[in-house]
């Protein structure tokens, strides 16, 4: 059993080591080949994750297979902190994504999104001007609205209203239905200058391709709807990852006890069993 737990920890950490290689390579590739600032923004976190997994895996591998007790202790301490971190992140993700959803519009295939429907913490992230300028730049570079226009440019208004748009397309690429603007094409609308609008997005809308509704509250809400969906998926993956970490940690504790017992035996009898 002693050998089994040490060998199992070694095998699991060898698999983690193999996993860290493509993650690290992907981060390096992004830093060198990323065509936009948004793509390059991910390189440092990905590289850091790859290096972290590699170092932890090597520590666990050496500590268990070579029976280096102090190194295995450090490995288990880091694993314990990682389990706490993943648990807290998972709970936090569920808490901040429990609010907010698109609002169905009568007679329309798409939904519209309001910033106030989402959690206060998420709202503060996008209402920060510095944060939003970076996000806005990424949205423009992704050509989310240009692709929408190219896809539906010749579609008549009645057909366009029946389309199922994504949260970003609905929030960033067209004005709110409350504005009552006249449809020309998916990203070009004629403003109604005679009416008064309570929705501030109606004044923010601009037909210029680099502006559109990228500064609208609806665009920020559309982004948060995407974030909400993504975080819920990440939280589910985190639960699986957490179970894996707990299993590895438990087996690692067995290996640590084995190492301590062997060290004690060695001090008493002069050799390891």
From Swiss-Prot:
Any one cellular-component term (Gene Ontology): Golgi apparatus
Membrane protein topology class: Multi-pass membrane protein
Glycosylated residues, chain numbering: 192
GO biological process: auxin-activated signaling pathway; defense response to Gram-negative bacterium
Transmembrane segments annotated in the record for this chain: 8-28, 46-66, 76-96, 236-256
Compartment(s): Membrane
Pfam annotation, one family: Tetraspanin
Extracellular compartment spans: 29-45, 97-235
Keywords: Glycoprotein, Membrane, Transmembrane, Transmembrane helix
Cytoplasmic compartment segments: 1-7, 67-75, 257-273
InterPro entries per UniProt: TET_plant, Tetraspanin/Peripherin, Tetraspanin_CS
Record-stated family: Belongs to the tetraspanin (TM4SF) family.
Free-text function comment from the UniProt entry: May be involved in the regulation of cell differentiation.
PANTHER family, alphabetized: TETRASPANIN-8-RELATED
Record's protein name: Tetraspanin-8
Gene name, Swiss-Prot/TrEMBL: TET8
